[in-house]
Amino acid sequence: MKILLYLFVESENVGKAINALSEGGITGFFLYDYKGMSPQDWQGFLLDEDPEMAIKAVSDLAQNAVLIGTIVSENKLMEIEKLIDEKLADCKYTIIEIPIEGIIVNMP
């Protein structure tokens, strides 16, 4: 089975993360640059109900981060997780794994 692996890292750690995934044998990936907040940063924080003020507050407080997505074989998943843990041991990261039932690629 194939797994969609999402790896969320702070922007300054994207090189370490891609190196770990590459050592694990990934064949391709995509990056999504975003701003995010962890639950610890959000705890006890109340937003003004004005949408523009809320978006500005979150934007000012959020950290720059990158989401790396890649498709991996289930049998390589443990090895990749181990490499991520080794290479990013001193970094904050989140891994999400989603089973893939099918993949369709159109390459005209």
From Swiss-Prot:
Q: Name one Pfam family in it.
A: Nit_Regul_Hom
Sorted alphabetically, which InterPro entries does this protein's record hold? N-reg_PII-like_a/b, UCP005637, Unchr_N-regulatory-PII-rel
SUPFAM superfamilies in the record = GlnB-like
Q: Which family does it belong to?
A: To M.jannaschii MJ1245 and M.thermoautotrophicum MTH1110.
Identify this protein by name. Answer: Uncharacterized protein MJ1244
The scientific name of the source species is Methanocaldococcus jannaschii (strain ATCC 43067 / DSM 2661 / JAL-1 / JCM 10045 / NBRC 100440) (Methanococcus jannaschii)
Question: Lineage of this protein's species?
Answer: Archaea, Methanobacteriati, Methanobacteriota, Methanomada group, Methanococci
